[in-house]
Amino acid sequence: MASYTMKLSTYIEMWSQYETGLSMAEKIEKGRPKLFDFQYPIFDESYRKVFETHFIRNFYMREIGFETEGLFKFNLETWLIINMPYFNKLFESELIKYDPLENTRLNTTGNKKNDTERNDNRDTTGSMKADGKSNTKTSDKTNATGSSKEDGKTTGSVTDDNFNRKIDSDQPDSRLNLTTNDGQGTLEYASAIEENNTNNKRNTTGTNNVTSSAESESTGSGTSDTVTTDNANTTTNDKLNSQINNVEDYIESKIGKSGTQSYASLVQDYRAALLRIEKRIFDEMQELFMLVY
């Protein structure tokens, strides 16, 4: 029970006093945002909740050093704004100092030079012979067939008209009035008359059919043989002189864990370094609380 002011736990539990069955951690989480309802600098935003929870647990049963909780919160905010930039640098230096999962970091810089000279002399002799033979045979056969057909038809008509009159004239007893054959005059007398009148008409029809055909065949063949022989001899000489200058600059880095220390041990050492900084902060924040126990 507080003797002079109020305990920090009283302020924290005030925000969950009507809720039953809560654990201590749940009560602290309910009251934490109410206590730290202001902004202050922190090296890593994800570490803010961890830091605030550790602060409450460290001073949970301590009496605040001011008459009211409002005055306490004002001085708490002021202290964090003024002092946390310094402690943030300490936190950051621990992060920069090393990776918690590494205990070895080795950088090696080197220079290597390699000169190589090479002389090659190569003689190459070769020969080549090629024989070739070819046989060509040709055969040609040509068949030609042709035919022609001519059909003709002739039609004609012939008409003959003949008129003959023979007249013997003595002293006529009486006059006649006969028309001449050409119709241009008349005959007045005749002792005897003989007439022939002939009409002939002929129709002629002729048909001419001519068919002709022709067929020819020709056959030819030929054979040719060719024999070729090629001989070739080659001689080559290759000379190669080479000089290689190789300069190598290298940087070798080895980073990781070596030795028998486990990763769990490395992480534990890293957390211990952060807790040591927190302990320094909480030691200096004693001035915000009553120095009675």
UniProtKB/Swiss-Prot annotation:
Residues 174-184 have a biased composition (Polar residues). Residues 112-123, 130-140, 162-173 have a biased composition (Basic and acidic residues). Residues 196-238 have a biased composition (Low complexity). It comes from the Viruses. Residues 104-240 are annotated as: Disordered. GO terms for biological process: symbiont genome ejection through host cell envelope, short tail mechanism. GO terms for cellular component: virus tail, tube. Keywords: Late protein, Viral genome ejection through host cell envelope, Viral penetration into host cytoplasm, Viral short tail ejection system, Viral tail protein, Viral tail tube protein, Virion, Virus entry into host cell. It is found in: Virion. Forms the proximal part of the tail tube. Belongs to the phi29likevirus proximal tail tube connector protein family. This is Proximal tail tube connector protein.
